[in-house]
Amino acid sequence: MNSEKPLFSFFVTSDVQLTEQDHVSHQKLASALQDIHEVDPETETLIMNGDLVNNGERKSYEIFQQIMDENPHPNQVYYTIGNHEFFKNDGNEPSIQRFLDFSGLEKVYYDATINGYPFLFLGTESWGPVGSPTKDSAVLSEQQLQWLAEKVDVLKQENKPVFIFLHQPIPYTINGTDIEYYQNGVIQDKEVRKILSQLKHAFLFAGHSHWDLRYPSMLVKQSTNFVSSGAIYNTWGLDEEGGEIVTDPAGSQGLYVKVFHDRVQIIGRDFSTKQWIPEYTHTILI
């Protein structure tokens, strides 16, 4: 890897899908945190982009926090809500509240400034019903979209990259999002696209699909840079019938992002083998 020192760096992960009884999920989270620390012990920021827990249970959040406390990790950890945070299936409000209690946030959408660069975090505000083709979709309220539009209206005046995080990917972007299940992945996808297209250098990171970062087109450069961040719990891919299937139950992946004054470098990391993913090394000029 290039020895030039970046302005700053951060890691992006998603889809830990931890539960109390699934000790493999505990081990994978701990292993990922340890590898992140070994790769760059000086990085100060980690984004965990949804599906932190598999069932939305408060006990799962408690174990998640315990593992975080027991392992080295960057000082600043930012969370987004995914679809699995709703899987206790007791309604939107209690599901969201458990996530907010865990994360210490006031809303599922918020912003931060990290090393002088803007970060925007989005999140679904509704889930279900079970059996619906939009059960796992991201639903963004008018208030959230208005908030995003107002943030972008200010940020579009700058030439800095803007880093945005939403658990579900925008349909018809990264590989796999043309599959039927993902076609309704973000109900307000057209609105989000339109808002983000005003930015000169927008990076929208998504998890959810678990698709192996070794596949082509897991980062797509359109008016916005659409970025897949892999998954900690396992990796998926295309099956022989045009659907998707688990390709590696032991797979565990995430991203290492380095920001320079003239470019952003995004590199895939295999936490299970503690190796870089050469197929997922991207440099986007600013």
Task: For the regions a language model picked out, list residue spans one by one.
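Short acidic, glycine-rich surface-loop motifs adjacent to enzyme active sites
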Residues: 155-175
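A short C-terminal boundary segment appended to hydrolase-like catalytic domains
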Residues: 1-5, 248, 252-286
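Short, well-ordered beta-to-alpha junction loops that form the rim of enzyme active sites
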Residues: 123-124, 165-170, 207-209, 269-270
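Surface-exposed cleft-lining segments at the edges of enzyme active sites
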Residues: 18-21, 51-53, 126-141, 175-181
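Active-site neighborhood of phospho(di)ester-bond hydrolases with catalytic His/Asp-centered motifs
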Residues: 12-14, 45-51, 77-83, 163-166, ...
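Extended active-site neighborhood of metal-dependent phosphoesterases/phosphodiesterases
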Residues: 57-158, 187-201, 214-266
